[in-house]
A protein has these predicted regions:
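C-terminal catalytic "cap/lid" subdomain
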Residues: 1-78, 82-83, 128
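Conserved acetyl-CoA-binding loop-helix of GNAT-fold acetyltransferases
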Residues: 122, 128-145, 153
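Short acidic/polar active-site loop segments enriched in Thr and Asp
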Residues: 17, 149, 168
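Conserved catalytic-core motifs of GNAT/GCN5-like acyltransferases
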Residues: 152-154, 163, 168-191
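Short beta-strand-to-coil "C-cap" segments at the C-terminal boundary of structured domains/repeats
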Residues: 193-196
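A conserved beta-strand-loop-helix scaffold within acyl/acetyltransferase catalytic domains
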Residues: 78-122
Length: 196
């Protein structure tokens, strides 16, 4: 295996973008490597495949694909393409090899020195790998950079996840006045806040 890895590294050092080591004993290994996102072999690249970054207009379709199942099951509030396009500058994403696996948005309320962390989504196949924590750190960093002293979330299902990360429950009337006006009392979302 060491020999093959060194050959792959040499290939990448000489301009090959990606080189693969495939198990010869698996029938159809080449097809699985090409057509399944995670593949079946070992890939050596001369670049970072995973990135945490701010979203751009090119990411709107990927964000919609990611959040749509969670909107349908009621975990997330429905967002239209137009809303995401309008607010794209608020979103941060985790992508792997061009596919968006997680996202979150920061909606600042500067008059109250707080911001809402919204649309927090990690794809089921990526859950448990730390992408949610990466996004939380990014949102906290962005909030600090613009002078916010806290962030808050509204959640109906993930309260325990946020509490484990330093959030505490507060009543809905804690929300900034502008956010209270939009609060959907029928959803019965829990309001959690974290001081930065």
């Amino acid at each position: 295996t060491g020999y093959y890895l060194s050959r792959c590294i040499t290939a990448c050092e000489h301009g090959v973008e990606r080189s693969h080591i495939l198990p010869f004993a698996v029938d159809g290994a080449l097809l699985l490597e090409i057509y399944v996102h995670d593949g079946i072999g070992t890939m050596v690249v001369d670049e970072k495949l995973e990135s945490l970054r701010e979203a751009t207009a090119d990411d709107v379709a990927g964000i919609l694909r990611l959040i749509e199942p969670f909107e349908q099951d009621g975990t997330l509030v429905k967002r239209s393409r137009t809303e995401i396009e309008r607010d794209i500058g608020n979103y941060s994403i985790v992508e792997h090899d061009g596919v968006i696996f997680a996202c979150a948005a920061l909606y600042p309320y500067p008059e109250a020195k707080t911001g809402e962390m919204a649309a927090v989504t990690v794809s089921p196949q990526s859950q448990g790998q730390g992408d949610g924590d990466k996004l939380l750190r990014r949102i906290e960093q962005r909030a600090r950079e613009i002078g916010l002293g806290s962030i808050f979330v509204l959640t109906t299902r993930a309260m325990h996840w946020f509490i484990k990360r330093g959030f505490r429950q507060v009543p809905p009337d804690w929300l900034p006045e502008a956010r209270i006006r939009k609060y959907n009392w029928d959803r019965k979302s829990q309001v959690l806040v974290k001081q930065l």
